[in-house]
Amino acid sequence: MDAELASWREAGQYFDYLGFDIFYRVAGSGPPLLLIHGYPFNSFDWAPIWPTLTQRFTVIAPDMMGMGFSAKPVAYEYSVHDHADMHEALLDHLGIGNAHILAHDIGDSVGQELLARHEVGQQAYGTLRIDSITWLNGGMFVETYTPRAAQKLMSRTPLGDIFSRVQNSPLSRRLLEPTVREMFGPNTKPTRHMMDVFNEILDYNDGRRVLHKVGRFINDRYTHRNRWVRAMRQTAVPMRLIDGPIDPNSGAHMA
């Protein structure tokens, strides 16, 4: 395993969620800040800004079920609601009742669900009060969300279950890498080393076999769109959007 990635894992710990091990990191001092990572990687996404954030906040960064260093069960109903439950359970486990949120990609949808619960006081675990939310690129509005064709085929059709059997093949990696690179700007494309690290994260605990199942969160975006957007329109929680305009899924066309 890459040394920096291994160091990230060694600095973390696990808690039990529904009988599964969920990886998370906590560091820093100050107001609690919950980081909700994107799909299909994990909390290591935050590594470049981790030192800066931990200077000002007590930072909590879990890996969602099916991703990163957390459990990746095959027989599991992955959903945005379940991811939201896990984040609430973790904060409750840590004795944290309020937090700022920084969310990205699928994390935006999880943040929207947490916000909707916050507005009516109906949390699954604990009594989380949201101090603020900062949204990074993510499909918060399905009418402007344009997922890649491969993601739609793998996540919204039976092809996902069929192709999951060959997800660990070299061909699968070659097909995935252009999609990943497309998410980056022209001056920030991942190096070969970074792509190798991404592949290590996906391969950990045979994670590619559930990649398409986790990716079905895009269906939740359609199902719960009105409830989530209503919460955003009605809330008094301070919000900010930081949007990379070149993102083909949710770039300038969403902002």
What are these regions (language model features)?
Residues 48-57, 93:
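A short, Lys/Arg-enriched amphipathic alpha-helix followed by its capping loop at the start of a domain
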Residues 16, 25-26:
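Well-ordered beta-strand positions
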Residues 1-13, 20-22, 32, 40, ...:
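Flexible "cap/lid" subdomain of the alpha/beta-hydrolase fold that forms the substrate-access gate
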